[in-house]
Every structure is written in structure tokens, then in C-alpha cells.
């Protein structure tokens, strides 16, 4: 290379050194030497074009604070809260004091290694692959913004995602139609009954069930237009996960059950001097106030316990998964199931929610068996 830049072998990486604004800048590069030379030429070109400047002294923690403030108005409250906790409790103590201009891929890779081996705050080992990827996603996004604003020359977290452990998706639990019926009977006289009914009958998410009002139900059609989320300061309504409302045609039995619940709820509220209206939440406390999402999550297992030790220990969110599985087993078209769930593509539905149960496997085996019988008969007839 020219005298303006040098490349030195450092272990299993290369150190690139070059001049920027009268100062020496360095970058650690992993890969082949010819690729390191290509990278150095690109850096020198950026310097010549004036696109680079002396590395900023702003620390990573200071930048994350600014970045999170910019993101607050554009991000769901619960997501912003999770980002803030990752920045403050995971990234900050480890590499938060490193200036942005000195944050290298090698330093971030070391941080990721520490996350995997001793990242838990309680000192009991490393973080899960999913949490490690949450940290990487946040860091990559924040540093990408810094690079676009020319605070740093490039995003040092860009190429590190491939080094993180893969997330192994567990088999999702699901109830079959018979089990779903038993669960509905168990919760019928409780305040969480309509939430369970909407999750099973319409495939709604937890927050969507808790945000639905009587004004959203017209005949047998429920408009899913918002969600109720839990934040550090309380609860808040927000748009659905995919950002737009959807219309779900309810099974007639589900719609009838909701109308019966509406009468019961009106009587409950009247005893407290409260008048039911179109804005009244379908799933609410006895005084008409919103149910806390976490309260629903914690209350739900109590009813499962009443169904005996052999009953599947599903989470509330698994009722949505059960809804899709039951619909698929009943022969409902995959695209229609996807639309009811509010997914952007059929692939998401097939990958995450459509879980073949034992009955479906047995039916598939029978169809294959019947096909082989036809083949055997055809061969016999030809003989």
C-alpha cells in the first residue's frame, strides 16, 4: 500500500492504519489480506472525498441516549423500554465508555463473547441466543444511524450478526378443539372469559383482546384497530403489531357468546353506577377499567391448574397459536388464517403458528396409506 496507509497482521485479524485530519485512525479487519487491502483503499478514498473526519469523542452510551431519544416518538412504548434497558444495563456497563470513533468490530466481537459466557446480570452464565441477538440488533441499528450521520466512518457491528448463535425455535404448544372447549368452560364465569374467547375464536394477540371495545364489534365482525401494552409507567394503547387495522369475521358461536357477555357486563357495571357504552372495553375489570396485560398473563395459569395435571400447560399467547392450528385442522385456507391473524405474509403464519397436531398427522398418514393402496390395486390389475 501507499505511505498514507499501512496494514499489519494482528493475530487472526489485520490492523489498518491511515491518516485522517492530521491524526492516525485505526481499524481492525477480519478476513483475507486482499480484502483488507481493498478496505484500506476504500477508507483512503473516503478521506480524499472529504466524507470522513476525525473520530468523534462521543461515547457509545452518550450516543445511545441521543439515539433512543430520537427513536421514542417512532417506537412502541414497550419496545422503547426494552431498548433502554438493554442500553443501560447490558451495553453501558461493558462498552458504554468507549468513544464511537474507537469502537471496532473486534471490540464488539469480544463484547458478544462475554454476553454468551457471562452476560447475565445475576452472574449465572451467559445470555440466551435470542437476547444476544436483541442486543446486536439494537447496537447495529444505533451505530448504523451514527455512520449515516458521519459520526463514524462505518458501522462496526455490520458484519457480526453471522457470528451469533442461532435461535432454535421450540415446538409451540397448542390446544386442540376439545381442550379449547374445556378451557372456555373453566373460565366462563371469570373476568378473563372474553379474552380467552377472542384469543381462541379470533386468533387475537393478548394486547389486541384487551384493547377491543364494544364499538369495534359490528354484528359478527370485529375490527382490530389497536393494542394495549404494558410500559414502565403503566399501560398504553397503540396500533396493532403490523401497523394497520384488520377485520375478523367471528364464528357465530363466538359472536353469540360475546353478546351474552355484553349483557352480563352491563349488569355488573350498572351495579357500580357505570353505564356501558361503545367505548367500554370487552375485556375489562369489574369496574370497566382496562385489565393489565401482566395481570392476565399471571391469572391465566390458575384456571389451567383447575383442569388437572394432564391438561397442557400453555401460555395465554398459545391460545392464538391454538386458534390457527384448529382452523387449519378444520380445513380453513392458509391465506385466510394468515389474514385473520394479521400477518403480512403466509410464510410467517406457516412458520410460527400452524402446528400440526396428532390428529392431523394421523389423517396425513391415512391419506398416504390410501394412496399406496391405489398404487397396489393398479399394479395388481395390470398383472
Language-model features: locations:
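Hydrophobic (often cysteine-bearing) scaffold residues that line and stabilize catalytic clefts
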Residues: 60, 76-79, 83, 104, ...
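Short, basic (Lys/Arg/His-rich) helix/loop patches that form interaction surfaces
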Residues: 121-125, 182-193, 202, 248, ...
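Short, polar N-cap/turn motifs at the start of nucleic acid-interacting alpha helices
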Residues: 215-221, 332-352
Amino acid at each position: 500500500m501507499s505511505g498514507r496507509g499501512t496494514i499489519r497482521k494482528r493475530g487472526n485479524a489485520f490492523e489498518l492504519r491511515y491518516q485522517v485530519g492530521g491524526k492516525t485512525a485505526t481499524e481492525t479487519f477480519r478476513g483475507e489480506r486482499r480484502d483488507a487491502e481493498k478496505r484500506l483503499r476504500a477508507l483512503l478514498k473516503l478521506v480524499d472525498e472529504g466524507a470522513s473526519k476525525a473520530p468523534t469523542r462521543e461515547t457509545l452510551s452518550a450516543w445511545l441516549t441521543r439515539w433512543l431519544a430520537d427513536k421514542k416518538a417512532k417506537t412502541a412504548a414497550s419496545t422503547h423500554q426494552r431498548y433502554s434497558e438493554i442500553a443501560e444495563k447490558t451495553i453501558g456497563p461493558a462498552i458504554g465508555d468507549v468513544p464511537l470513533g474507537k469502537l471496532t468490530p473486534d471490540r464488539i466481537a469480544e463484547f458478544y463473547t462475554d454476553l454468551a459466557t457471562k452476560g447475565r446480570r445475576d452472574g449465572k452464565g451467559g445470555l440466551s441466543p435470542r437476547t444476544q441477538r436483541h442486543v446486536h440488533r439494537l447496537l447495529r441499528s444505533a451505530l448504523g444511524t451514527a455512520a449515516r450521520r458521519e459520526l463514524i466512518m462505518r458501522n462496526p457491528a455490520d458484519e457480526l450478526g453471522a457470528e451469533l448463535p442461532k435461535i432454535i425455535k421450540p415446538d409451540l404448544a397448542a390446544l386442540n378443539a376439545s381442550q379449547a372447549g374445556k378451557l372456555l368452560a373453566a373460565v366462563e364465569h371469570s373476568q378473563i372469559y372474553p379474552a380467552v374467547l377472542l384469543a381462541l375464536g379470533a386468533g387475537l394477540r393478548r394486547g389486541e383482546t384487551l384493547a377491543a371495545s364494544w364499538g369495534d364489534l359490528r354484528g359478527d365482525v370485529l375490527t382490530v384497530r389497536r393494542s394495549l401494552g404494558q410500559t414502565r409507567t403503566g399501560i398504553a394503547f397503540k396500533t396493532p403489531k403490523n401497523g394497520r387495522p384488520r377485520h375478523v369475521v367471528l364464528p357465530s358461536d363466538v359472536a353469540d357468546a360475546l353478546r351474552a357477555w355484553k349483557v352480563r357486563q352491563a349488569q355488573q357495571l350498572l351495579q357500580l353506577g357505570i353505564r356501558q357504552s361503545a367505548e367500554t372495553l370487552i375485556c375489562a375489570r369489574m369496574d370497566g377499567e382496562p385489565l393489565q396485560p401482566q395481570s392476565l398473563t399471571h391469572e391465566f395459569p390458575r384456571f389451567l391448574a383447575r383442569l388437572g395435571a394432564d391438561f397442557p400447560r400453555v401460555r395465554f399467547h398459545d391460545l392464538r397459536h391454538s386458534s390457527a392450528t384448529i382452523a387449519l385442522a378444520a380445513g380453513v385456507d392458509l391465506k385466510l388464517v394468515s389474514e385473520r391473524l394479521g400477518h403480512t405474509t403466509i410464510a410467517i403464519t406457516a412458520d410460527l403458528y400452524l402446528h400440526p397436531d396428532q390428529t392431523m398427522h394421523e389423517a396425513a398418514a391415512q391419506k398416504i396409506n390410501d394412496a399406496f393402496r391405489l398404487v397396489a390395486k393398479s399394479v395388481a390389475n395390470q398383472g
